[in-house]
């Protein structure tokens, strides 16, 4: 979770998100991303972002494509908003959300990769693997 602590107003990535405070950040995961999703949800809410958590509501085993599709469908009618998708490795849910032409999901492993995916590739979904983040 070191990357979450690095976020602050002086960070260029965070500055880019400032305009997003008026839009929504959708969160989705499978059971393997449940804990990280909760941490991110609390962090975003504490920093005054509008957050909609698409689930799951419990840490029971669920299928990542179901929640990836939920996230993609929310973004379909809301091009100003973005999403964060989480599963164990990030790979499965990344494949699931990238099936839709309006989604540009980037599986990232560093703050710099996240910043560049937004800046250079106009990524609208950040994908993380809970089992791969220390």
Name each model-derived stretch.
Residues 26-28, 32-35, 111-134:
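C-terminal binding/interaction regions
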Residues 66-85, 89:
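Short, structured active-site "lid" loops
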Residues 21-25:
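Extreme N-terminal starter segment of soluble prokaryotic enzymes
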Residues 50-61:
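A short beta-strand-loop structural module common to alpha/beta enzyme folds
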Residues 92-103, 112:
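Short Gly/Thr/Asp-enriched flexible loops that form oxyanion-binding sites at enzyme active sites
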């Amino acid at each position: 979770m070191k990357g979450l602590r690095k976020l602050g107003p002086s960070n260029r990535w965070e500055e880019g998100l400032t305009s997003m405070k008026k839009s929504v950040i959708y969160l989705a995961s499978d059971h393997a991303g449940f804990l990280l999703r909760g941490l991110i949800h609390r962090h975003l809410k504490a920093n005054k972002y509008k957050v909609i958590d698409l689930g799951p509501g419990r840490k029971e085993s669920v299928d990542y494509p179901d929640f990836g599709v939920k996230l993609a469908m929310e973004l379909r009618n809301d091009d100003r908003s973005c999403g964060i998708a989480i599963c164990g490795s990030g790979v499965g849910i990344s494949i699931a959300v990238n099936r839709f032409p309006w989604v540009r999901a980037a599986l990232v492993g560093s703050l710099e990769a996240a910043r560049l995916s937004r800046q250079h590739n106009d990524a609208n979904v950040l994908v993380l693997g809970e089992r791969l983040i220390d």
